[in-house]
Amino acid sequence: MANKKRILSGVQPTGDLHIGNWLGAINNWVTLQEQYETFLCVVDLHAITASYNPKELSKNTISTAALYVACGIDPNICSIFVQSQISAHSELCWILNCMTPINWMERMIQFKEKSIQQGNNVSIGLFDYPILMAADILLYDADFVPVGEDQKQHLELARDIAQQRINARFSKDKNILKIPQPIIMKNGSKIMSLIDGSKKMSKSDPNEGSRINLLDPPEIITKKIKRAKSDSSIGIEFNNPERPESKNLLMIYSILSGKEISQCENEFLETGWGTFKKLITEQLIESLEPIQKKYKLLINDPYQLNKILNEGNEKAEDLANQTLKRVKSKLGFFEMEK
């Protein structure tokens, strides 16, 4: 591991993971895990920035970790851990809060979008979400962070805080915090809603028909694809801006089948929606079956799951505490003699 560069990423346990989480994030981690020292977090502190059910949070956290492994993450070479189990996340977040100008935060696009959705229920936590994300990344001296286009601004904020507000102010020679670089995930990075091709597939969408969950049984997948928004045109296209639903479903089919987009377009040039929906349904059911089988084995083996998380937490906590100690020392905090 010593010679490998390190990556850090994570998903919120805010409900069932869907194919957007899988194809846009987890599937890419599976590809990267052999090349990088990989730390993967279940970001449960982020999950409480919006309305949530306390009775479901712990269950969803375990389920998310199990799905990481079921989707192909290898706990023998990756550290899988739970954010709230490592107090350094919250502590570094507070330190970064005190170093970050508020006008930097006011520029965050996602807060503006999400605050409209939440109305009067917007919390300080939602506003502060990007600072906690910065703490998540910077704690682990990540060399790279896999991000989609919608998360680029948050990573840029983490980089700016580390360089301009910590390194430049408190260290004249060696950097206190490592400046992470993005790995922009193009393949499947933005899987869209089944009922509105202009919106990203989301766990928070109240309409269950907008997404395919990783644990959906075949009959539910069939029903959701059958009801997915389509149009009156013949042929399934990718580059027609007036047909976002066509582009979205073709992208999903392309990734799952392992075929190039151009090959899929040629294959379905004169195919009607009914035929295409039948084919993509079959592909989804076939692709999700091994994930669902492995998930059921894991979720029914709490000893194995706890072992995976305990080992991951131990590695993550050791690394996080080293970084936090370094930051606090450079920023002038009192250190108790032992």
Located regions from the model:
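Short helix-capping/linker segments at secondary-structure and domain boundaries
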Residues: 102-106, 139-146, 255-264
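Short, histidine-centered active-site or binding-site loop motifs used for metal coordination
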Residues: 11-13, 44-46, 143-144, 205, ...
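Short, polar/flexible loop-turn hinges at active-site or ligand-entry regions and domain interfaces
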Residues: 53-54, 144-148, 236
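Conserved nucleotide- and phosphate/pyrophosphate-binding catalytic cores
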Residues: 21, 159-338
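Internal, conserved structured core segments that host functional sites
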Residues: 110-169
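N-terminal Rossmann-like or analogous alpha/beta NTP/dinucleotide-binding catalytic cores
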Residues: 2-8, 13-135, 283, 296
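A generic secondary-structure signal for well-formed alpha-helical elements
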Residues: 65, 72, 100-103, 142, ...
